[in-house]
Amino acid sequence: PGVIEAALLADGVPADKLYPLDLDRAFKKLDTIKSDIIWWSGGAQSQQLLASAEAPFGSVWNGRMTALAQSGINVETSWEQNITAADALVVPKGSKNKEAAMQFIALATSPEAQADLAKITGYAPINLDSPKMMDPELAKTLPDAQTASQVNADMNYWAENRDAIGERWYAWQAK
């Protein structure tokens, strides 16, 4: 999720009317900038493209922007129409180390760990008790405080349509 929604937003589709995704319209909009797009294949590459100014702006994970800023690179984050997506921690059924994995998840999602993680990475905590342990100035900079124009990716839609969107996406990239 992300690029298709961004293309539709750029083409004037209101955030509350994104789904179902109009793929024809999205790819038509992407066609207008295709020759100027630099695709990155990992978070570190997105940072390098911005740090070197090879890419003057981009759609980047906010934690990578935090790391750039913490390293002294002159970057700023625009939260206008920021697109959020869900993530999950899972333990596969039949895991040999299920107990250790569950202990890790409990520790990693504890209020203290999530507050520390937010400070280090710039990612918002998932534990609702974490913000009261955080510096209020830090909390103001995190993604969950940037909701005025936030766009939530419809993860159910993506789960149901991922294969079809993926086929269309890869065909578009290849041409």
Where are these regions (language model features)?
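Sec-exported extracytoplasmic/periplasmic mature domains
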Residues: 8-13, 34-35, 51, 55, ...
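Mature extracytoplasmic/periplasmic domains
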Residues: 92-150
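Solvent-exposed loop/turn segments at secondary-structure junctions
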Residues: 1-3, 62-66, 82-84, 96, ...
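Periplasmic-binding protein-like
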Residues: 27-32, 69-95, 130-131
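Short, hydrophobic alpha-helical packing/hinge segments within bilobed ligand-binding/sensory domains
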Residues: 46-49, 65, 101, 114
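Extracellular/periplasmic bilobal clamshell ligand-binding domains
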Residues: 134-175
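Extracytoplasmic ligand-binding site segments that recognize negatively charged/polar headgroups
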Residues: 1-54
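A ligand-binding cleft/hinge motif common to bilobed small-molecule-binding domains
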Residues: 57-74
